[in-house]
Amino acid sequence: MRQINTFNEDVLVGNTIVKAGTYTISFDADNNKITVLRGRRVMASARATLEMGDVRARRDSVAFVMTDLGKKLDRITFAGHFGTVIITGDTSSGGQ
């Protein structure tokens, strides 16, 4: 699963600050991990799980939570899929 998303401001993904910009966000269900890419360059990754739902998502969406460090990516919904990806922890970061 993947989607293209534009962050209008800096966002925390796992333990990495991702600068405002347009990125591809992908979810690897086999490894329970999301990856944020700019082109082929990994900007951040984090552990995540797929929470299955009853209804197929009509559109891509992202949700954030506010932390002491700022806005943090919390969950991602991919259009056409039954479920929401919940970010559960930190893994690694790429270069900024």
PLM feature spans:
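Mid-chain, structured segments of secreted extracytoplasmic proteins
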Residues: 37-82
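Primarily extracytoplasmic ectodomains and periplasmic/lumenal surface modules that are beta-strand-rich
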Residues: 29-33
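A sequence-level detector of short linear motifs
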Residues: 19-20, 44
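Short acidic, Pro/Gly- and aromatic-enriched capping/linker segments at domain boundaries
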Residues: 1-12
